[in-house]
């Protein structure tokens, strides 16, 4: 389960109207969502046509800053006041969230990845990155899938597999060893199955550069939107979490890690 799965499930439920023109506040009641998940969810409120999406700062936020050596924040905490009213008050139990894949041509056109896997949808490219899923933790989750899949003999991506780190800092960080990968770096794990690491930019997310989709091509991506012609004129983009994209690259068709014999285990794949 990831932030991408959560937001695709929300957009599936809401359709194209519920959050249109709204400000959306998310409350992580159990304080369990890491910043990478929150970033993905809030970022993709643009795809819900909302004015904005926010998580009020809490101890998870402050801990994230402290780990980066930032303790004195220049702005006060912003949160809804006690008398705030909401046009819609909705609860989503994370127990209801499964790995998801959004089909063309809307992020809300989302389905359980296990159901999509039964269709054996073929594709040309598996692409990980974008402002919604290019953080170190996003890439680590994908690398953990590959790392554990290699133990099952899956050692080669069956399709073009390209990764776009979310920033120059992330690009440098993924070259360093990570203990959760047995001392390998994320980049080494990606390259071990034939993955390619690109510069940090939007690229095919908005149909630019050599990795953009050509007419008739299809890609499964961790990008934020899959509108018609978005990733390249005449191409078809599907949306999923980095973990699902990595699993699909190994499987050769769109599928969650469970299709590789890797059921979700928060102790193994959680970030």
Residues of each region from the PLM?
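Fe-S-dependent hydro-lyases/dehydratases of central metabolism
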Residues: 1-271
């Amino acid at each position: 389960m990831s932030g991408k799965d959560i937001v695709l499930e929300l957009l599936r439920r809401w359709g194209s109207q519920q959050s249109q023109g709204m400000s959306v506040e998310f409350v992580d009641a159990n304080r369990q969502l890491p910043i990478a998940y929150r970033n993905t969810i809030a970022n993709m409120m643009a795809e819900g046509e909302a004015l904005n999406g926010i998580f009020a700062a809490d101890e998870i936020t402050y801990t994230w800053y402290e780990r980066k050596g930032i303790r004195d924040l220049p702005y006060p905490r912003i949160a809804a006041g006690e008398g705030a009213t909401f046009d819609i008050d909705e609860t989503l139990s994370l127990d209801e969230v499964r790995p998801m894949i959004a089909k063309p041509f809307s992020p809300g056109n989302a389905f359980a990845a296990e159901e999509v896997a039964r269709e054996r949808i073929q594709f040309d490219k598996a692409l990980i990155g974008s402002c919604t899923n290019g953080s170190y933790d996003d890439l680590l989750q994908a690398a953990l899938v590959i790392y554990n899949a290699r133990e099952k003999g899956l050692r080669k991506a069956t399709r073009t597999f390209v990764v776009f780190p979310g920033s120059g800092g992330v690009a440098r960080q993924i070259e360093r060893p990570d203990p959760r990968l047995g001392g390998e770096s994320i980049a080494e794990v990606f390259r071990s199955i034939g993955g390619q690491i690109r510069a940090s930019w939007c690229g095919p997310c908005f149909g630019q550069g050599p990795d953009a989709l050509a007419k008739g091509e299809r890609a499964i991506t961790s990008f934020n939107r899959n509108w018609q012609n978005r990733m390249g004129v005449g191409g078809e983009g599907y949306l999923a979490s980095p973990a699902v994209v990595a699993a699909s690259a190994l499987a050769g068709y769109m599928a969650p890690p469970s299709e590789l014999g890797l059921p979700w285990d928060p102790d193994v794949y959680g970030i």
